[in-house]
Structure formats: structure tokens, C-alpha cells
Amino acid sequence: GKPRPQQVPPRPPHPRL
């Protein structure tokens, strides 16, 4: 069996400096 892909939570956008 193939391992299930781990669900990565959406990352917040980087603050524009």
C-alpha cells in the first residue's frame, strides 16, 4: 500500500516589508 500524503495546512501570506 502507498502511504497517504500528509495534508499541509495553508501557510499565511508573508507580510510585505
From Swiss-Prot:
Induction: By bacterial infection. GO terms for biological process: defense response to Gram-negative bacterium; innate immune response. Keywords: Antibiotic, Antimicrobial, Immunity, Innate immunity, Secreted. It is found in: Secreted. GO terms for cellular component: extracellular space. Belongs to the apidaecin family. Antimicrobial peptide active against many Gram-negative enterobacterial and plant-associated bacterial species. Not active against other bacterial species like H.pylori, P.mirabilis, B.pertussis or N.gonorrhoeae. This is Apidaecin +. It comes from Dolichovespula maculata (Bald-faced hornet).
